[in-house]
Every structure is written in C-alpha cells, then in structure tokens.
Design a protein with these regions (language model features):
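Loop-helix junctions at membrane interfaces
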Residues: 1-164
Length: 164
C-alpha cells in the first residue's frame, strides 16, 4: 500500500511539473520554433521520467492530460486534436518504458509518436475546414519536429535519471 501512495505522489508531482513547464510559454514569450523545440523537449523528458520513476503505465495519464492544457492555453486551435496528441503521448511513453533496455528500440518511440500525431492530425484536417496555412503549420508541427523533441526528451531524461 505504501508503494502505491509513493507512486501516486510521484505521478502527481510529475504532472504538476509538466503543467508548470507547459505554462512557460505564457510567461516567457518565445518564437514559435523555439517554443516548440524547447518546451516540447522538456515535456517529453518529464513524461519519460514519470514512467521510469513510477514504473507504471498509469503515468501515461500525464501524456493524456497535457494536450488539454495546451488547448486551454491556446496552443491547439482544434479541440479534436486533444485525443490525437494524447494518444501519441501515451503510446510514446508506453513504448519508451517497454523498450527502455534497448537503445535502438527506445529511440523508435519518437517515430511512433510522430507517426500517430502526423496521421491523426491529417485525418482531423480532412474533416475540419481550416485555412491552408493553419493546416500546413499543424501538419508540420506534428511531423519531424516530434521526432527531434522526442529524442532530445529521451536524452534529457537519461541524463536526469542517472543523477537521481
């Protein structure tokens, strides 16, 4: 019972940290690409650390909650992207946890996430009419930058993990 409480408290702490990091963009105005790569990498690192630290797939709840925060902050223009991003985050976290012992498989996690986000975003864009510029920007944001931020997040999480 004690271990369950510890895991729950750790999970809540990681969720709070992720939401605070996600809110940096509200306090410190960064250019779009810097915002995406910097904050995205930090959030990916927190998601990875949360699942490694708690040793539980329950940590994937963080990946499901973060897109709601992004929508409420005005970072997502469509509410329909919340489940797409949540699914991508949860699959990314589960993949990285499952294959944490294999570096090659570990770094396939960002590819899985980018594939889900890119495919899901394009499905949403096919259903919802948006100006071309907005649609292209969303498609771009959900493509290769997700691979970069995912890999950087894994590296950052590994550095922090070794110091814990």
């Amino acid at each position: 019972m004690q271990d369950r409480w510890k895991a729950s408290v750790r999970l809540a702490s990681f969720l709070a940290l992720a939401l605070v990091l996600q809110s940096i963009r509200l306090v410190v105005p960064l250019p779009g690409p810097v915002n995406m790569f910097f904050i995205g990498s930090l959030l990916n690192a927190v998601m990875i650390l949360s699942i490694w630290q708690t040793r539980s797939y329950r940590a994937c709840i963080i990946g499901l909650i973060l897109p709601m925060g992004a929508f409420l902050q005005g970072q997502l223009p469509l509410v329909f992207l919340i489940p797409v991003i949540g699914l991508g985050n949860a699959c990314f976290m589960a993949w990285v946890y499952r294959f944490r012992r294999s570096r090659a498989a570990l770094f396939a996690g960002p590819l899985v996430k980018a594939g889900i986000l890119y495919g899901g975003t394009n499905i949403v864009l096919a259903i919802v009419a948006l100006p071309d510029v907005v649609g292209q920007t969303l498609s771009f944001m959900m493509s290769w930058p997700q691979i970069v931020t995912g890999c950087v997040g894994i590296v950052l999480a590994g550095i922090v993990w070794r110091r814990l």
